[in-house]
A protein has these predicted regions:
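A conserved mid-protein helix/loop that constitutes part of the nucleotide-sugar donor-binding site
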Residues: 21-34
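Catalytic binding pocket for nucleotide-activated donors in carbohydrate/polymer assembly enzymes
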Residues: 81-166
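A structural motif in glycosyltransferase catalytic domains
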Residues: 14, 29-32, 43
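Conserved small/polar residues in nucleotide/adenosyl-binding loops
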Residues: 168-170
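Donor nucleotide-sugar binding/catalytic pocket of nucleotide-sugar-dependent glycosyltransferases
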Residues: 1-8
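Conserved donor-binding/catalytic core segment of Leloir-type glycosyltransferases
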Residues: 8-23
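Nucleotide-activated donor-binding/catalytic signature segment of Leloir-type glycosyltransferases, i.e.
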Residues: 7, 40, 44-81, 138
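Cofactor-binding loop segments of dinucleotide-utilizing enzymes, especially the Rossmann-like FAD-
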Residues: 19, 46-48, 73, 115-117, ...
């Protein structure tokens, strides 16, 4: 694919389209990158920003070929390709007054995984395992382990639901 990852339906594909800055939660992602790459995931990143985050993603794309796709530029067309092809969309923002990316991911049927702040809290309804409602997954505290746990939880629900996907909004 254009993203430099082999097509693998068994891998949970997580997209990130963002300015690579602290505000957007990249210190949390940086802290968990090695653990994240031990999971059965593929991570596709698109964006530019702070040099340390640009270099971090380049490093992990080199370290985990086929798992991490680092696209350190911005392309509107590619952003739509990512929204359309990923299983989940990660936005662990420290603060996010409004946030458009989670709305785009919802429009494409890609599960948002967000931190409960500002516009993210207002627009993503957390999954409720008891009645199967919700539009995505969220975590409360600005904490890397909480984010990681939420990603793993989203993966397990996603695979459980994939069998009877037609019957649920998720």
């Amino acid at each position: 694919s254009d993203l430099g990852l082999e097509k693998d339906d068994k891998k949970f594909m997580i997209g990130v389209v963002s300015r690579l800055t602290d505000q957007k939660g990249f210190d949390l992602i940086a802290y968990m990158m090695d653990e994240l790459c031990q999971l059965d995931v593929q991570l596709v990143v698109l964006g530019t920003g702070e040099e340390r985050y640009e270099n971090m993603f380049r490093h992990f794309a080199w370290k985990y070929p086929g798992k991490v796709s680092a696209n350190i530029f911005y392309s509107e067309a590619m952003s739509h390709k990512i929204y359309a092809s990923c299983d989940a969309f990660l936005m662990p923002s420290l603060f996010e007054p409004c946030g458009l990316s989670q709305l785009m991911s919802l429009r494409y049927g890609t599960l948002p995984i967000v931190r409960e702040t500002g516009g993210l809290k207002d627009t993503v309804i957390p999954y409720n395992e008891y009645d199967g409602t919700g539009t995505g997954f969220s975590f409360t505290n600005y904490n890397a382990h909480e984010m990681f746990y939420t990603i793993k939880y989203a993966m397990s629900v996603y695979y459980d639901k994939r069998r009877d996907r037609k019957s649920t909004r998720l």
